[in-house]
Amino acid sequence: MEPNMLMRFASVSKLITAVGIMKLQEMKKLKLNEKVFGEKGILRDTVYNNSIKDKRYYDITVEQLLRHQAGFNNYAGDPVSSTRYIMMQNHLKTPPDHPTLLKILLKRHLGYTPGEGKCYSNLGYMILSMIIEKKSGMKYENFMQKYVLHPAGCYDMHIAGTYLKDRRPNETKYYMHQGSIPVYEYNNSGRLVEKCYGDTDLPRLSGAGAWCGSTAELSRFIASIDGLPHVKDILSKKSIEFMTREQTDHQYSIGWNYTPKSNKPWIRTGSLAGTSAIVLKYPDNQCWILITNTSTWKGHGFSNDTMAFFEKLRKKYMANMPKKDLFL
C-alpha cells in the first residue's frame, strides 16, 4: 500500500457533493432554500411530478437534502443500494438509471414531513448529484472535478467502478472480512459475487458514495474547506462557516456528519463492502484520516473504535510529532 493509491471513499463522498452544492450557490446558480420538486422545482420534469402521490414532496428543499431532513427513510431498505429488489418489484430487465429510479421512488410516501425529522439518506445525496447536473449543465463527475476537486489540488479523484476489472491502475484491491459469504449480483443476473465486487453498482451511488482517491489528496481537499489560511480555500468563509455551524439535537451538518464547536473534531465517516473510511478534523487543525480496503464485521461501529484509537495515538505521540506543513 502506497500513499498515492486510490481507495473508495464510501460516504465521505457526501462531503465532496455538499461542497459542489455550495459552489453552485456561490456561482449564483442555486439557492439552498429552492424547492426540488413541483412546477417551479429544480427537477420539475413532468415524469417526476406525475409520479408524486405524497404532496409533501413539493416542500423538499436543497438544504433539507443536505441535512438528511427531506422526509426519506430506509424502512424498506436503502433504495440506492437495493437495485436487485427494485428490479424484481418493478419487472425491470436492466438496472434503473437515476431518472428511472427516482420516478419509481417518488411513488412512495415520505416517512416524515420534510424539515420535521431526520434520517440518514443516500437517496438524498443521489438527488443532489442530479441537481448538480441540472444546474450546471454538466455531468456530475465533470463538474466536481473542474470546479471543486482540481481547484483544491486534487487531480486523481474519480467515480469508482463496481468490479475488479474496473479498478484503476493505482487503485487498491478490496477484501471482505473472514467468514463473509457471497451475495447475489446487484443487476439480478442470479450470479453470486463477492460483496465488495458486485453487491452495489458504485457509479449509481454517485455523490452519495462513489468517489475514490488517495488519502493524501483527501487530506488536501479537507484543508481546502477548513477556513484556515495554510491552504487556499475553494469556498468562501461564509460558506464554510455555514457548512460547519454546530447543530442542535445532534442534527447533521452539511456534508459532515457532525461539526461540534467544543474541543471535539469535525467528523465524516463512510462504509461500504470492502471499505471503511473516517475523517476527523481536530480543533488544533490536525486532520486524521483512515481508509481501509477490507470490510469489518463491526460495520459502522468500526468508526467509533477508530475514533477512540486516534485519541490514544494523539495523547501518546502528538507532542513529538514534527511541526511540518506537508502541503508546502
Regions found by a protein language model. Name each.
Residues S262, W297-L328:
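Short, gly/Ser/Thr-rich active-site loops of penicillin-recognizing serine hydrolases
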Residues Y48-P265:
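Short, surface-exposed loop or secondary-structure junction motifs
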Residues K28-L32, M138, L228-I234, M321, ...:
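Surface-exposed helix-capping loop/turn segments at secondary-structure junctions
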Residues M1-Q64, Y112-S121, S206, W288-I289:
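Short active-site loop at a secondary-structure junction
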